[in-house]
Swiss-Prot record:
Its main location: cytoplasm. This is Alanine--tRNA ligase. PANTHER family: ALANINE--TRNA LIGASE, CYTOPLASMIC, ALANYL-TRNA SYNTHETASE. The gene is alaS. NCBIfam families: alaS. The lineage of its organism: Bacteria, Pseudomonadati, Pseudomonadota, Gammaproteobacteria, Pasteurellales. Its cofactor is Zn(2+).
């Protein structure tokens, strides 16, 4: 019986024997694709090839692609652990044809791999296939070409309420490439409930889809018209976990070898004896998605991809808590994961220390609030009415205890309770955007500028070339000519202009000819062509016209200083902070460089100085900057770093600066590092959880920045009547004096507040034996209010005190309750009730709570509501 690792390798070997290029799995973070939250199919990395926007050196490819479906449109998270086949992470085996073979070979390849004794050797009588209802060609190939009996071939029509809306018709989106597909199903046998595809019992587990073969033969336009593609292509996908379950003779994916080893380790770490416990499945699944997301540069955070990762980690930790885990355990699964993933685990192995560290830190952080949050949820669930948990409670768990909604839903599901999601959404307000980042992703591929041919880039050696205009786009539409004053995108056959890529902004300059000038403000890539974006200043410009393309060299030189300095900065960061530093984004312009990178801990000022000194050391070393073109595998073997969000071909350009820095890069650089002159870090900050940003200037920009700082220093010294060398000492003296004065003032305020408290005590009213004071006080800060409340609680014995004060346009509220009453009156609930009247919110302990608001005109309403509530509840 084959292991999962052996099945993965057999698939790749089979298609390699059929002339396919084996292509590595792409990152789970899609490269240059804003339409996807995560890579969720094997074809994602080839999408631009299918769209005609990119080319490869091969026309046949095969992959074992890592995929994540959690968050956004494709979200399996809530079902993971409760079904036999839902996962957050899975591997998609695929073979692809880019205008090479089509239906005949695609079908025969699939059948041979599945049924040949040399490969998987599945019994033919166990296999069924579906085809699109009108796809007679595929039907004929299956029946006549392969020999599948007609009672094992099922036609599936439009079963989703619209033309071409079918389980057997695939589309990339509302527009773009699409076509019929054929699916292969495996029959697990009569002992398993379920019916054939298309039947009422098709959702059962007897007949399981193992392979989907898509025939991309149409391009759907916005009006629904189907155009035939000039080069039909093939995209296939077979879930590795599903086919492993078939080969290993089990009905559930969680019973295959890789999951059984992970489940056994989870059971060992948590002490769980029942190996069928669903929580074991959840954790075994989640370690795979979490580890590989971190490997591909995702950091737990409160937005976008990072928030999805945080949700998955916290769901796993909560299920560990259910199993009885008493200590951090999740990160301890990483070594087992590396082992069970075999060759596919090498990427995790390379970053094992960082993966384990981030998982441990996230688990420790969540553990601080998990038990308190679960206690609150348990209390709320006991009091649930009509089987619905209020959205307000769900939001409090999210906002205060870090419980993602799906984690709360997980707990509720176990007790057959649903969540008032509408109420939760109302409470979320602006914060709802955190978990919904995927909803912003989308594009209409027919609006992409698409031009046949390519632009030859001459910019590495030239700043001016003669070129021909091959296309013009005005207001998004292709035109034959433009006139003075019109802004447009100009496509050339050759160009010295660098198009924005790798964080480096596009070149500026001009296109000139007799009586014609087009000012280029930016340069962008559109597939294989370069677009020169700008405005025609003089004359007319026509398609086919020959022009001179002239780069603004001053702008380019300044940009190149910053780009080369960015490489030195990246190397310095890794040397000072550690090899876990990975680029998360960058901007290289003519005025500044910005570098975002993964770093779980804060960077000290001393570390920033060390990084800055290291960069300047290598600038002074005046290293020769060497560029070479080589196969990507050779570049990686030499240690060249590939950068976040960049797409690389089979042959890459490597930029090396001495022995200090080596990166894959297509940008413009200096010839020697000494040309940079000077490097100065101007800021270092955190921009998200686990992501830091460094901004810096170079050359003349660095000198200007230092001169500006010198001016500020001298002006500050003049204002404080000090010299620059004594400025820190002078500021310290002023701070000490201010603190002393502030302390004296606060003491006077507290003394005054205690006197006021004695006077206020006389105004207390009694409600059923409880002293009650509800008042608005003038000219009081929050500290003074708390002093008065504490003093009154001591004076009055059994009491409830509620104060409101106005400071300019803000409202402050303080509520105090003596401890004997906190079972009946909770300060936090009462202060929130009052705060709602003045447009605010707050919280605190049962005996003392504070809140703020922004509607002072409603103070009287807050006081009235408080009085009414106390009369009703005391």
């Amino acid at each position: 019986m084959k292991t999962t690792a052996e099945i993965r390798q057999a698939f790749l070997d089979f298609f390699h024997s059929k002339g396919h290029q084996i292509v590595d799995s792409s990152s789970l973070v899609p490269e240059n694709d804003p339409t996807l939250l995560f890579t969720n199919a094997g074809m994602n990395q080839f999408k631009d090839v299918f769209l005609g926007l990119d080319t490869r050196s091969y026309t046949r490819a095969t992959t074992a692609q890592r995929c994540v479906r959690a968050g956004g449109k494709h979200n399996d998270l809530e079902n993971v652990g409760y079904t036999a086949r839902h996962h957050t992470f899975f591997e998609m085996l695929g073979n692809f044809s880019f205008g090479d073979y089509f239906k005949q070979d695609a079908i025969k390849f699939a059948w041979e791999f599945l049924t040949s004794p040399e490969w998987l050797g599945l019994p033919e009588e166990k296999l069924y296939v579906t085809v699109y209802e009108t796809d007679d060609e595929a039907y004929g190939i299956w029946h006549k070409g392969v020999g599948v009996p007609e009672n094992h071939i099922i036609r599936i029509g439009d079963n989703k309420g619209a033309p071409y809306a079918s389980d057997n018709f695939w589309a990339m989106g509302d527009t773009g490439p699409c076509g019929p597909c054929t699916e292969i199903f495996y029959d697990h046998g009569e002992h398993v409930w379920g019916g054939l595809p298309g039947s009422e019992e098709e959702d059962g587990d007897r007949y399981i889809e193992v392979w989907n073969i898509v025939f991309m033969q149409f391009n759907r336009l916005a009006d629904g018209t189907m155009e035939k593609l000039p080069k039909p292509s093939v995209d296939t996908g077979m879930g590795l976990e599903r086919i492993s379950a078939v080969i290993q003779h089990v009905n559930s994916n969680y019973d295959i070898d890789i999951f059984q080893k992970l489940i056994a380790k989870v059971a060992e770490l948590t002490g769980e004896k029942d190996l069928t416990n669903k929580s074991l499945r959840v954790i075994a699944d989640h370690i795979r998605s979490c580890a590989y997301l971190i490997v591909d540069g995702v950091i737990p955070s409160n937005e976008g991809r990072g928030y999805v990762l945080r949700r998955i980690i916290r769901r796993a930790v909560r299920h560990g808590h259910l199993l009885g885990a008493k200590d951090t355990f999740f990160y301890k699964l990483v070594p087992v994961l590396i082992d069970v993933m075999a060759t596919a685990g090498k990427d995790v192995k390379a970053k094992q220390a960082n993966v384990e560290k981030l998982l441990r830190l996230e688990e420790e952080q969540f553990a601080r609030t998990l038990e308190r949050g679960l206690a609150l949820l348990d209390e709320a669930l006991i009091n649930v009415k009509d089987g619905v948990l209020s959205g307000e409670v769900a939001f409090k768990l999210y906002d205060t205890y870090g419980f993602p909604l799906d984690l709360t839903a997980d707990v509720c599901r176990e007790r057959n309770i649903r969540i008032d999601e509408e109420g939760f959404e109302r409470e979320m307000e602006v914060q709802r955007l955190r978990a919904q980042a995927a909803s912003r992703f989308g594009v209409d591929y027919n609006n992409v500028i698409r031009v046949e041919g390519t632009t030859t880039f001459e910019g590495y050696t030239e700043a001016e070339t003669q070129a021909k205009v091959t296309a013009l786009f005005y207001e998004g539409k292709s035109v034959e000519s433009i006139s003075a004053g019109q802004s447009a995108v100009v496509i050339l056959d050759d160009t010295p202009f660098y198009a924005e890529s790798g964080g480096q902004i596009g070149d500026r300059g001009c296109l000139i000819a007799t009586n014609m000038r087009f000012d280029v403000k930016d340069t962008q890539k559109y597939g294989q062509v370069f677009g020169h974006i700008g405005t025609l200043i003089q004359g007319t410009l026509n398609v086919g016209q020959t022009i001179n393309a002239v780069v603004d060299t001053e702008h380019r030189i300044k940009t190149s200083l910053n780009h080369s300095a960015t490489h030195l900065l990246h190397a310095a960061l890794r040397q000072v902070l550690g090899s876990h530093v990975a680029q998360k984004g960058s901007l290289v312009s003519d005025t500044i460089l910005r570098f975002d990178f993964a770093q779980p801990e804060a960077i000290s000022q001393e570390q920033l100085f060390e990084i800055e000194c290291l960069v300047n050391q290598h600038i002074r070393a005046n290293h020769l900057v060497v560029t070479e073109v080589m196969p990507i595998d050779e570049a990686k073997a030499k240690g060249a770093m590939a950068l976040f969000g960049e797409k690389y071909g089979d042959v890459v350009r490597v930029v090396k600066m001495g022995e200090f820095s080596i990166e894959l890069c297509g940008g413009i650089h200096v010839k020697r590092t000494g040309e940079i002159g000077l490097f100065k870090i101007v800021s270092g900050s955190a921009i998200a959880a686990g992501v830091r940003r460094v901004e810096a200037v170079t050359g003349e920009g660095a000198i200007n920045w230092l001169q500006q700082q010198q001016v500020l220093l001298m002006q500050s010294a003049d204002l404080l009547k000090s010299d620059a060398n004594s400025l820190v000492e002078k500021i310290q003296q002023l701070q000490d004096k201010a603190k002393k004065t502030e302390k004296e003032l606060q003491a006077l305020k507290e003394k005054s507040a205690m006197k006021a408290g004695s006077d206020i005590a006389k105004s207390a009213v009694e409600i059923n034996g409880v002293s009650v004071i509800v008042q608005q006080l003038e000219n009081m800060d929050v500290k003074s209010l708390r002093v008065i409340v504490d003093d009154l609680k001591n004076q009055l014995g059994s009491a409830v005190i509620a104060f409101v004060t106005k400071n300019e346009d803000k409202v402050n509220l303080v509520v105090g309750v003596t401890t004997d009453l906190t079972s009946k009156v909770k300060a936090g609930e009462l202060v929130n009730l009052m705060a709602q009247q003045v447009g605010g919110k707050g919280g605190g302990r049962p005996d003392m709570a504070m809140a703020g608001g922004s509607q002072p005109e409603n103070i009287s309403k807050a006081l009235t509501v408080c009085n009414e509530w106390l009369h009703k509840n005391l």
